[in-house]
Amino acid sequence: MNRKYTRLQFAAAMIGCAASFAFAPSAHAQAAPDYAALLAAPDRSDNDKQADKRRDPLPFLQFAGPRPGMKVLDMGAGGGYSTELMARAVAPNGAVYGQNPADASDKMKAAFDARLATPGMKDAAADVRPFDDPAPPGTKDLDMITFLFFYHDTTYMNVDRAAMDKAMFAALKPGGTLVIADHAALPGQGTTVGKTLHRIEESTERQEIEAAGFKFVAEGNFWRNDADTHDYPSYKKDAPIDNFVLKFQKPN
């Protein structure tokens, strides 16, 4: 994005997103791509490849399992790093919506829009919608939703989390999956440190998701870190951070 969005431009982007994918034929997902080769693609930006060293995306891709032909919603997409990874994984006949709220920061909007112009985003579109109503209108056939390191932020924002979780459930097809990652808080802290430490208790997040009808199916331990004392902000530079990753499914 080399320009600032007005609310009208955001509305246009949202409508364009829905028009792009809502009526596309549903493609059958194929075999998983070579995720290591995807990450090594020569047209990925140097910034993203540097970010890979910190974010370690390979085990996440292997755990989540995006495949060509899938339709994916990337919640709290931010500047689009994870959206692009999903878009590359579902290419050439899939679709990815990168969701951000209309009141996201100008810096975040600019980063996402600039990314949309790159080759890796040809199967992606902006989805400018609130967290508690995140999918394009009428969407009920998503194969996957990803929600990375932002659920804790909704605990102090003006977001109805119960409505958000139910909306995600409704947007998935039966058998579709929700893969969610967040920064771990101490037992008993629940949502109380969402704004101060940018963390959330794993059991609290799981309980909220399951209350919407999701079935818990797997946990990934690849981003856990026992050296984290959980008493400092998750954004503390160079500090060890304990992250949990959970996979849920909408029952058939």
Regions picked out by a protein language model, each given a short descriptive name:
Residues 146-150:
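A conserved beta-strand element that flanks and buttresses the S-adenosyl-L-methionine
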Residues 134-145:
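A short acidic, Gly/Pro-enriched loop at the edge of an enzyme's catalytic core
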Residues 87-88, 160-174:
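A short glycine-rich, Lys/Arg-flanked "PGG" loop and its adjoining helix->strand segment in the class I
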Residues 108-136:
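S-adenosyl-L-methionine
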Residues 175-183:
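Conserved beta-strand signature within the Rossmann-like core of class I S-adenosyl-L-methionine
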Residues 69-78:
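Conserved class I S-adenosyl-L-methionine
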Residues 228-252:
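Core SAM-dependent methyltransferase catalytic element
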